Amino acid sequence: MLLLGSFGGGAIRYRGGVLDALGLNFLAFGHAQGISNTVLWVGQLLLIGAWVHLGRRLFKKKVADDTADAADLGLVKRTLYAMVVPLIFAAPMMSRDVYSYLMQGAMLRDGFDPYTEGAAVNPGPMLLEVSHDWRNTTTPYGPLHLWIGDMITTVVGDNVTLGVVAYKILSIIGLAVTGWSIVRIAQHFGANPAIALWIGVANPVMIIHMIGGMHNESLMVGLVSVGLLLALKKRFVAGVALIAVAVSLKATAAIALPFVVWIGMHHFAGFLATKKGKDSPTLKQQVPAFFATGAAGVAVTGVVVSAITWASGASWGWISEISGNSKVINPLAFPSLVASVITMVAEVFVDDFDYNAVVNVVRSISMLIMLGGLVVCWWLFRQNERRAVTGTAAAYAVAFVFNSVTLPWYYASLISLLGTFKPPMWLIRFAAGASVFIALMFTGSGNHQLYNIVTVIIAAIIAWLATVVIFDDTDPATTATEKPSPHTVS
């Protein structure tokens, strides 16, 4: 249904495209577009329903016995394939960002600087598909993002359709790599890999926005996931290098690096303790191990990012653009939510209350909270490998809640890790409900419904019902991805 609805109700081309080539343009207008939107919406509900049913089956089996982990993992994988395969052939949906990616790559190809110039400086077929809001906006992404776009547009020229296909392939690779590594991280910590894959990769937010929307988070999250896995397997330099590659794609990946330093420190300190004939490291081993791994991490990151920046032909202007663009305002970002509530109350008393002034102040305060929260997370989750990965997820949560701009696909970095570290059941419940809610909040064309009260209420009810269906037999005090002990089985 998502596949069928995408060609009339998705983020389709303004000019040309598959419908135009087939003489089916009427599907994108009038009543036919309404039908396409309905089909797409039904597809969203069916995708969510399949995910909920799968979750219910997993958690019922988890409560009943612990004998079918391999079968459960196979079931999740087969369901994931069934979700992804139809979307391979679907049009872009829930976002027009893929057209901006192509445009930015074409700018680098044609000698423009996307860090100082907007897409409008390079007219052509790709510019026509870029959302009007972003035609005069610089890119917040790293040099690898531009390099990939440069290579794709060099190969496909100005053929937008082929460019979209190329990004679809990259998105699928990114999600596949994420799934591969998440299963192994969960196994490393003794967590249930089936549930980790269910909540972290088969999640409707991941499917809809990573494959349907083709966001560069898909590749970034894949690189970070493999980097974390390598670090856990005592391949610190390789792990940091891969995460550094992800940083050069999108700076958000850098949040994981300080926690990888903790992982590397524990490994190196353990090695130093073993050389001294001790079972566990002392502070004397931990302190030099910390500085050694920290210095190595900084050096490797600097070399990798510098090499990619140089090889891509892009400038260092991406450093100044890391903060992103402040045009996007929605309640997913805490400062926007607070400013909206303040304005709603204030307008009762002041007719011309200035929302922009309020949101600017709240964003500044929220940014300080975010920076403080990241430091606190880094320090609190330093004790061992598992705590470091948990801290990575916590830090991503802090960053996305308190950042000035937040969009659903940003949460891919957090969602992917949720099932790997044996989280408490309440966290999985909350994540499942929030995932269903967020998955329902965007239309196929890419417009959010977060200010549509009726839609928000309906989505909230559906999300609540989903959690009831999935977890009706589970104890909220238990650990979500840990296999139950034999004595707990009735």
UniProtKB/Swiss-Prot annotation:
It is found in: Membrane. The chain crosses the membrane at residues 34-54, 73-93, 163-183, 194-214, 226-246, 253-273, 290-310, 329-349, 361-381, 398-418, 424-444, 451-471. It is an enzyme of class 2 (transferase). Disruption phenotype: Cells lacking this gene show a complete loss of LM biosynthesis. Mutant results in the formation of a truncated LM with a reduction of alpha-(1->6) and alpha-(1->2) glycosidic linkages. The keyword Calcium does not apply. It is a multi-pass membrane protein. GO terms for cellular component: membrane. Its main location: membrane. Its EC number is 2.4.1.-. InterPro entries: MptA-like (IPR017822), MptA/B-like (IPR049829). Keywords: Glycosyltransferase, Membrane, Transferase, Transmembrane, Transmembrane helix. One of its GO terms (molecular function) is glycosyltransferase activity. Involved in the latter stages of the biosynthesis of the alpha-(1->6) mannan core of lipomannan (LM). Catalyzes the addition of alpha-(1->6)-mannose residue. Belongs to the MptA/B family. This is Alpha-(1->6)-mannopyranosyltransferase A. It comes from Corynebacterium glutamicum (strain ATCC 13032 / DSM 20300 / JCM 1318 / BCRC 11384 / CCUG 27702 / LMG 3730 / NBRC 12168 / NCIMB 10025 / NRRL B-2784 / 534).
